[in-house]
Amino acid sequence: MLKSRIKYNTASFVTSAPDITKLPADTGIEVAFAGRSNAGKSSALNALTDQKLARTSKTPGRTQLINTFELADVDDMRLIDLPGYGFAKVPIEMKKKWQKSLGEYLQKRQSLKGIVILMDIRHPLKDLDRDLINWAISSEIPVLALLTKADKFKQGPRQSQVLKVRRELSALDGDITVHAFSSLKGTGLPDVAKKLDEWFLGPVVAVPPAEKILNDDTNPTS
């Protein structure tokens, strides 16, 4: 079982919205999942929540709406599945519509407190990925970059690719964390849960052990 402060398996579907006007009230905290149409975004959400929460399709580009999922064990906190971007075979008008919905959400949604950007580990940091990361940095939104389909690489090449992406993104001077991820093998899943816990609930503060107070009976004066 996934160890986390929030029970992500309590997530449930709320609504699918064509634009931000149809989303739930802009209150509380939202964490959005975004990525290219073939990056494995829906599979990552399903792995995190341990259920078939987000629809997966063998045809990239099928997610056309902003899908909202509510976390049952915490108040006013949501996971957002944003439309996939960058799939070449999508009709141009549909692509423009998706880009408009995505742009409106990212620019105007006040409850957005973190964004998970998923990229195929074999082809990371495409132009649209970089655009999204740069937007997040300029808006002071923290980013968790997941290099998906990590099971396609052995451990050595996988780690080399992670380090390469970390080096590139470190030059951007933003709050960016990079991990390898595989929804098939569960690689990186604890890292995702830990980061989302921080965004939703705040970082874990280490509490120093209470000082031992000695009273006159246990520490008599001479």
Curated annotation (Swiss-Prot):
Annotated coiled-coil segments of the chain: none
Binding site for GTP: 35-42, 61-65, 81-84, 148-151, 181-183
GO biological process: division septum assembly
GO MF assignments: GTP binding; metal ion binding
Stretches assigned to the EngB-type G domain: 27-202
Pfam families: MMR_HSR1
CDD domains: YihA_EngB
Matches recorded under PANTHER family: ENGB-TYPE G DOMAIN-CONTAINING PROTEIN, MSS1/TRME-RELATED GTP-BINDING PROTEIN
UniProt-recorded name of the protein: Probable GTP-binding protein EngB
Organism name: Pseudoalteromonas translucida (strain TAC 125)
